[in-house]
């Protein structure tokens, strides 16, 4: 079923939209939120002019560029969330369909791309809104194998595994490990005539192994021995990865952290890409599996409508926002139609058949090359959409330079009296450490609050690389002073549960999150 916003009754649908930047200068293909209240937005080179100039004297000279050998336009920018102002950044080589991940020190690792960027490794060391930090291309190291459409995942020791890519059915690491790239036959086995194994979904399980999903199959992979520990049953419903991608999340880790549940939703019908069929309806099925079970099976459920290129965003509450994308076609340039304006809320703890809620629709088509990222204030930043090889504004689905924010229902004004405010919390905690969080709430707290850690992933191509939500073990919430409460929290026991790095720490009261404070988790 293809849903038309014009014929749907819109009364009482939850959520609100706001335009925060009318012209970012670039269409963001890749987006990441830093601990300084800024957002890195990244497109690609070899496309000619963007709509944001580099500072005078900072032009990029690249004899290999296919369009501009002397390029004075920015293809990356940084957004200050406090002022909504944009500052241009400079990238040197092509980051088209590349991958990324934050490192334990808070720097953003960015790998691969196309053409002269396919083996490059870049870093962005974030700074405050008044700083002048910029991209750095590493000169002393590069990828062993060119990586285009790969996926990055931080590991328990803080290193990063880089999985797959076009004509790269292998894995490698940053920092580089002895032996270079290691073949992963699973990626070759699931490749079909239209690929469908690119940008694989990679989740770090609490047992330390990786859940790797590509096309319609998944394995549990022990990267330390390069062995497949478990082959999961195939997921019904067609391919799920680029160029047929839906999206995927690992649900919140909680309790004793031993159970990990993976959800995969949406995707294109097989053949839509290779036939260049823009009107083939996307499928709306979702599969949910307990990846740590000794006998895992997929539990199937259906979204209210089909979706290709949706983004699944873990909210601070443990619910999942599904947003962006189209209802027909596939990924690729000008290969989709029927924008999917309606977000969905997936509520994991509801019974099967009652987990999806349709939310207030947007008005801006967010098609191929769109992104969605959780912000520290609980909103979700929506950026990008460029279903064309170059920037093209006179089109049915134009290159999109606007940045929006979607506010879930928990940010509504009628929740203000139960919304917690974190007054005190540590800036750094060690694995397994007990620590206090002090919060204020206007109305008396009933029961216990949650304290949840949310990673800052690298969002691109309908998958947030490194996305993670960990619900901390907490003591009963006890009064400390007027409208103030003390929560004794225990940090995750190790990097298998939450790899070292910076996390947004939210207090959640009756399903309403605070504004997050950043905390660094260290061994």
Curated annotation (Swiss-Prot):
Region forming the signal peptide: 1-19
Cellular compartment(s): Secreted, Cell wall
Keyword Zinc-finger in annotation: no
SS bond list: none
Keyword Lipoprotein tagged: no
Enzyme class: oxidoreductase
Sorted UniProt keywords: Cell wall, Oxidoreductase, Plant defense, Secreted, Signal
EC id: 1.2.3.1
GO molecular function annotation: aldehyde oxidase activity
Reaction it catalyzes: an aldehyde + O2 + H2O = a carboxylate + H2O2 + H(+)
GO cellular component: extracellular space
Induction context: Induced by infection by the grapevine powdery mildew E.necator.
GO biological process, any: defense response to fungus
Any Pfam family matching the protein: Glyoxal_oxid_N
Role this protein plays: Catalyzes the oxidation of aldehydes to the corresponding carboxylate by coupling the reaction to the reduction of dioxygen to hydrogen peroxide. Substrates include glyoxal and other aldehydes. Involved in disease resistance against the grapevine powdery mildew E.necator. Is sufficient to confer disease resistance to E.necator. Can produce hydrogen peroxide in response to E.necator infection, and this may directly play a role in the defense mechanism during plant-pathogen interactions.
Protein name: Aldehyde oxidase GLOX
Natural source organism: Vitis pseudoreticulata (Chinese wild grapevine)
Upper taxonomic lineage: Eukaryota, Viridiplantae, Streptophyta, Embryophyta, Tracheophyta
Gene: GLOX
């Amino acid at each position: 079923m293809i849903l038309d916003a014009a014929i749907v009754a819109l009364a009482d649908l939850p959520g609100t939209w706001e335009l925060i930047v009318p012209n970012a200068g670039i269409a963001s293909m890749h987006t990441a939120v830093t601990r300084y209240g800024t957002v890195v937005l990244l497109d690609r080179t070899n496309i000619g002019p963007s709509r944001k100039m580099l500072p005078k004297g900072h032009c990029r000279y690249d004899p290999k560029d296919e369009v501009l050998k002397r390029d004075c336009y920015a293809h990356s920018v940084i957004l200050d969330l406090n002022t909504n102002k944009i500052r241009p950044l400079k990238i040197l080589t092509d980051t088209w369909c590349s991958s990324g991940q934050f490192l334990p020190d808070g720097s953003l690792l960015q790998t691969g791309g196309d053409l002269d960027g396919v083996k490059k490794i870049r870093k962005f060391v974030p700074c405050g809104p008044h700083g002048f930090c910029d991209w750095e291309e590493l000169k002393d190291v590069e990828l062993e194998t060119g990586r285009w459409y790969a996926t990055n995942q931080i590991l328990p020791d803080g290193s990063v595994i880089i999985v797959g890519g076009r004509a790269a059915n292998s894995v490698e690491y940053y920092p580089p490990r002895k032996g270079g790239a290691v073949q992963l036959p699973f990626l070759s086995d699931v490749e079909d005539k239209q690929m469908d194994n690119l940008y694989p979904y990679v989740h770090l399980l609490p047992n330390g192994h990786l859940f790797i999903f590509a096309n319609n199959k998944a394995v549990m992979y022990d990267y330390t021995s390069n062995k497949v520990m478990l082959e999961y049953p195939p997921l019904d419903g067609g391919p799920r990865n680029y160029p047929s991608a839906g999206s995927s999340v690992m649900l919140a880790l909680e309790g004793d952290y031993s159970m990990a549940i993976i959800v995969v939703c949406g995707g294109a019908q097989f053949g839509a890409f290779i036939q260049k069929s823009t009107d083939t309806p996307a499928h709306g099925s979702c599969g949910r599996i307990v990846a740590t079970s000794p006998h895992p099976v997929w539990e199937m459920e259906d979204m209210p409508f089909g979706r290709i290129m949706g983004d699944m965003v873990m909210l601070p509450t443990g619910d999942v926002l599904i947003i962006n994308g189209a209802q027909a076609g596939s990924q690729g340039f000008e290969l989709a139609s029927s924008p999917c304006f309606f977000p969905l809320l997936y509520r994991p703890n509801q019974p099967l058949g009652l987990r999806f809620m349709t939310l207030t629709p947007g008005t801006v088509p967010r098609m191929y090359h769109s992104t969605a990222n959780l912000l520290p204030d609980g909103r979700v930043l929506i950026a990008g959409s460029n279903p064309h090889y170059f920037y093209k504004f006179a089109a049915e689905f134009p290159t999109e330079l606007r940045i929006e924010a979607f506010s879930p229902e928990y940010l509504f004004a009628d929740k203000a009296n139960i919304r917690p405010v974190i007054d005190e919390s540590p800036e750094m905690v060690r694995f397994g450490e007990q620590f206090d969080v002090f919060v204020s709430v206007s109305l008396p707290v009933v029961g216990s609050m949650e304290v949840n850690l949310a990673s800052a992933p690298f969002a691109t191509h309908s998958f947030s690389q490194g996305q993670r939500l960990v619900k901390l073990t907490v003591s009963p919430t006890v009064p400390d002073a007027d409208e103030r409460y003390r929560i004794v929290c225990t940090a995750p026991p190790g990097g298998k549960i939450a790899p070292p790095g910076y996390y947004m720490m939210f207090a959640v009261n009756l399903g309403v999150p605070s504004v997050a404070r950043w905390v660094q988790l260290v061994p």
